[in-house]
């Protein structure tokens, strides 16, 4: 048994240095194998509003200064779907991590400002090695990325030379370099279906996404035991309650959710595919089980619909503290100072 750091689960606590320590029970999984390891609009009609972090009196001034800095730097501003509304509204592109990185690579910008978390900025650097990549907060990490240290992955790979490693894009550049192929939540099923039939599949780092892909494909895989700490907060009970309150509203869940939540969903899909589902749905209201920042994007894309954040047992919505570390003030300062800059070793 390979023991690695497990940074996600049902119970969370804040440790020294702002790092998250999360634990969860080890039983009840239905996957082939588990390693035991120690992407300014009115809000929805219901009155729910995605929280803004910048005071209104500062918003206009900061926005003008950021746009001027963008011109001065010949920069492109990218915002992940989970960013605060004022950053989404100011960005050139809003979307999922890989889609944004691809979009930035196609521009003539000299500087990419990625409002997201660290592995996303790394992905942008991989696809645009000659561009400067800035991240508003250097400490904006990810529980999934932290759950899969490269040295522990090497140890596991050494136990089976026949492993074919499929890495979810939510991982470090070092883990990507150790993998045979990279996938997103939107194409994971196709990637697994196309994997060599004579290889033993190892899926890292999200066990819930991996388990969902196993359900879709029937292909056995060894799953790294990592989770997004946000998406495992929803429970069967909390989702059942909100569905009873809104019986006519379909539930859309991200595949990073646990099986107990996925089994209650009308659609399980990536953030970008959520937009298409909501556009096509005849329902007037939709329950969304992903990070709450996505509701701002959905409300702008489908202003005629009501979007209901799926509640957890602890709160009425669910935020990623790492995503919310980025603010308009930090965006301004990182552009003014041209740091923090994300760099990668040339050999990597």
Model regions: which residues?
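Accessible peptide chain termini
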Residues: 1-2, 31
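Cysteine-centered motifs
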Residues: 3, 7-8
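Short, Lys/Arg-enriched N-terminal segments with co-localized hydrophobic residues
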Residues: 13, 17-31
